[in-house]
């Protein structure tokens, strides 16, 4: 039948993670008492899970799949999740076909419902083989349903869910959930706007529940069905199929206009309470009183761990829960019991505060890694700007500066979007050379990146990630680019093509300025901190010409795509790929402050875009990509591309004699902070990176070991990866990627791991970087705003430059 897992003896207090809180104030109030503590049970190994539920006899059940064979496994616990009995499940079979599951779930009586389809075995295509639209016809699989009985036998179920569609379009397979009363509920309809209730024994239809629009999710609380969508939460009675009304108080609390984190609702098996979780923690909504309370804070639980993905959360009893997570850091499963302890403080007394202007999930994860190693430290994450909270960037910075000057500021500051030089000149940032220099000496971090931030032997700031700008495209084209003028000339040359865009981004006038700033905006200010009118005028003239070529090309490409899509059956004549609607309201706000704050968010993308080499591997819809490599995976894509297309290459873009890099997640320590030593420990941890750095799109980690380990074939083999070597390419194979489009064109590409020559070249390029860019967001936003007015013909070139000078005169004189 299987094996029994052993219970872990140690009971750990909840891990200290991270909570998003606006502002910088720190209270000195006496700690309140009581919080949930985590007891980790030894979980099933070599598998991942996708469901956790309570059966009607009180047993706890999980369903998952083997990491090795991807076949389904059931897990049953008779003691509240402390020990598990496992059993491999047999799926329905058809001769000559393979079985693929869509959805699988436990019915309350212990039977298992499975949704599946049969398909021909996959045949590896020959190298370079491509299916064309002439010989490819996509066929929707025939979705089937069966019951796996408690004795392992299989019973087929005849269900035709396509009858609920309002048109001929298929919505794919239908998701289902099993209710505590034994019934099964399917999400159906052409737009997934219906829920159908079937008897769990006979599978006869009992009730139909219709939403106003697409139903995003549905859960059960006692005899109530709760459906959720973007803007409403509705309760139904599953005993009679009648609507009971909207949960107005919950809508306001969970999905209202002021809410920054969209909730995920949980099937907990509770009879009276609806649970949901967000980035901030787990909440309980009392169905009787209509009140909502946070019961588990992500700052002190695994719910704050970005590497743990919640699969199930069930109510075992009063103030007692069991949760199952898929743990990406270990490719395993975590089973955690939560019990309320009224005799401990609600948060650990030992606290440290980290601040960023905008929310940063990379920082979240890095702090999570620190907190796992330091469970007695409460790391509080404070965010200056939360979207739609009414706080402007100016307000947030004033609050931060006031707190720092008053000695109540955060201990660690993420300096992205802040004026670090101003803080340094005022003595507000601590010298970190005592923790950075040892990391340089033992080659933990890139020496040249750290040296770019060393002044008179002191280091006040340092990035944890960085990119460096490259231009990707046809070798002959990109080799002609050496400065802004030559880039404009190349744009002109490529503007006559109609079947491709010039760049792989759609640009408005403003975002084009943002994308060019790091390379060509460093001379907008003179040494006396006044506007360099000659340099800015030259920039406006050249970029105006460039923008005209881009617009001409985009218009032609849009027409080309409309003509192409018009060949598809069922084409909507009203369809348009014109981006004018996107640009029409760009940056428009009711007030100037709100306009500026909108730009703050947009700067995150266009100042530091990724080249996305994978787009050139498949449907190459653009001639050029300009930006930085987003990290390890993007470099793998680049190496694969270069080995598959000898005409494509890349060129590192420089700023005159400067080999620039674009830093991100720049950390500094508050010189007036009260926890400097702990702050240094946290910064050291941030510089180590974390286990999922390979999947980051922030660029390369400053931690050299991360790069070495990511491309180490020996380490991959030690970790259990079976790697095939392609002698013709002189590269190990990572795997294959597939692509298909609406016309039936499909293609597969063998992904290649960088070899030693590739890795050494990458290191050489990185080690020659010598200048980290800085961003004056106030200057940049004003320049982009006036450039937009100029190219739209609202004002003359001379007036646009004069407006920049006049509007920034006071700011630049401070």
Q: Which residues fall in each region the model found?
A:
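C-terminal capping/gating helix-and-loop segments adjacent to ligand/active sites or protein-protein/ligand interfaces
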Residues: 661, 725-812
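Hinge/lid segment of periplasmic solute-binding proteins
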Residues: 417-470, 485-486, 647-653
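Extracytoplasmic/periplasmic solute-binding protein
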Residues: 460-464, 469, 488-587, 598, ...
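Conserved Ser/Thr-centered positions that define the repeating blades of beta-propeller domains
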Residues: 77-78, 179, 197, 268, ...
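Periplasmic-binding protein-like
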Residues: 496, 684-724
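Short, well-ordered beta-strand elements
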Residues: 348-360, 377-384, 412
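Extracytoplasmic/periplasmic substrate-binding proteins
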Residues: 550-681
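Extracytoplasmic "Venus flytrap"/periplasmic binding protein-like
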Residues: 378-445, 615-624, 641
